[in-house]
Curated annotation (Swiss-Prot):
Lineage: Bacteria, Thermotogati, Deinococcota, Deinococci, Deinococcales
Stretches assigned to the SIS domain: 54-217
Extra information: A lyase-type mechanism (elimination/hydration) is suggested for the cleavage of the lactyl ether bond of MurNAc 6-phosphate, with the formation of an alpha,beta-unsaturated aldehyde intermediate with (E)-stereochemistry, followed by the syn addition of water to give product.
Keyword Isomerase: no
Coiled coil: none
Gene that this sequence comes from: murQ
Cited Pfam families: GKRP_SIS_N
Stated name of the protein: N-acetylmuramic acid 6-phosphate etherase
Amino acid sequence: MTDPRRTEQVHPDYADLDTLAPDALIAALADDQLGAVRAVQAAAPQLTAALNAAVPQLERGGRLVYVGAGTSGRLGVLDATELTPTFSWPPERAVPLIAGGERAIRQAVEGAEDDEAAGERDVQAVNIGPDDVLIAVAASGTTPYVLGAARSGRAAGALTVGLANNPGAPLLAAVDCPVLLDTGPEIISGSTRLKAGTAQKIALNTLSSALMVRLGKLYGNLMVDVRATNAKLEDRARRLVQHATGADADAAQAALSECGGSVKTALVMLKLGLGAQEAAQRLEGAGGHARQVLGEGEALGTSAS
């Protein structure tokens, strides 16, 4: 009997996959990944709805809580972890939960994803509340751990977003903002770390990056909230200030040194001729939106979904 979940079905076009020459094998595997991009493009309206719903939550100080199992859980951990160095997002406001706990990041924890009660407990343990945004990810959309977590988060009043790769998946009915990433059968049957996982990664990148844009973490397309924690990023910070202000390298570095390395504060200092303290205070008063401080336009509000 055929599994009704499309991600578990046998792809009809690749029955001879194990007989392909090396170049054809690589081409087939790479080409099939393009379906992930198409799936995310098709889900753009749903991602926009999730974005518009989540921004007010986060503006009130809410957290991003990611939930998943296996590949989906690891992708959530990755997205949560990268928000701090990229956007200076407070690490305590990005909470990744994975079935089986931290050990599951590096190795499979058999049976962990089947424990619905564990998902409920893990969400309750982080004291999820009405200002939080829970992003639940499961290729099948049927994973008990993820369903338990999503239902628990929703019951606690959190905004819930669900990413699943199967039409009609229970996860999509269990959340406030369902996002269907319809990637279909995998080139290696059932291996959802491939196309389904790629679509999840793109969708998470898209949603979290869009959230950071709307929360004032960028100026234009510049990462002005980047945390310079190594030599490469320190050099990038200086170049960002130069690009945004037209200042020379010495002036950019001096401003960064005065304000503790904040690119956003440095560009406001140089553009408005302010000291570090005054620039920082103005940014705080504008909710971190540099354009508003600079008088270059109001911070964008949410658009219609």
